[in-house]
Curated annotation (Swiss-Prot):
Homodecamer. Signal peptide: none annotated. Belongs to the RbsD / FucU family. RbsD subfamily. One of its GO terms (biological process) is D-ribose catabolic process. It holds the Pfam family RbsD_FucU. Its main location: cytoplasm. PANTHER family: D-RIBOSE PYRANASE (PTHR37831:SF1). This is D-ribose pyranase. The gene is rbsD. Substrate binds at residues 28, 96, 118-120.
Length: 129
């Protein structure tokens, strides 16, 4: 049994399997999951766990070279937008419909209990060397 780090075996496995440019998504509880994409459902109740709780943990354990968000997040979810833009200087913003289409390329979508609009992000894996 792990003493530290990510205890969720599905998330741990997905992260360890990521190669350069592979993508995972952290999603609010409302984002549709394409049928051929692995869904890791962490949602317990509305708001738990939050997007930011999951995001902060993944940031610590993943080499991230690129992020994509829905442009609507800037206006409709300023608190999460501010945190993400504080962490990454370059962020690709696309409309929400395009964002949803891009999720079909993800290795996995991690569904949180987040219940605020547009609390979704695509994280693209970098390399550690």
């Amino acid at each position: 049994m792990y003493k530290t780090g990510i205890l969720n075996s599905d998330i741990s496995k997905v992260l360890s399997d990521l190669g350069h440019t592979d993508q995972i998504v952290i999603a609010d509880c409302g984002l549709p999951v394409p049928k051929d994409v692995k869904k890791i459902d962490l949602a317990l109740t509305l708001g738990q766990p939050s997007f930011l709780e999951v995001y902060e943990v993944l940031k610590q354990h993943m080499e991230i070279e690129h992020v994509t968000i829905a442009e609507e997040m800037e206006v409709d979810n300023a608190p999460i937008f501010e945190q993400v833009t504080k962490d990454f200087s370059e962020i690709e913003q696309v409309n929400h419909e395009t964002f949803k289409a891009l999720t079909k390329n993800a290795k996995a979508i991690i569904r949180t209990g987040e219940a605020t609009p547009y609390a979704n992000i695509i994280l693209q894996s970098g390399v550690i060397f």
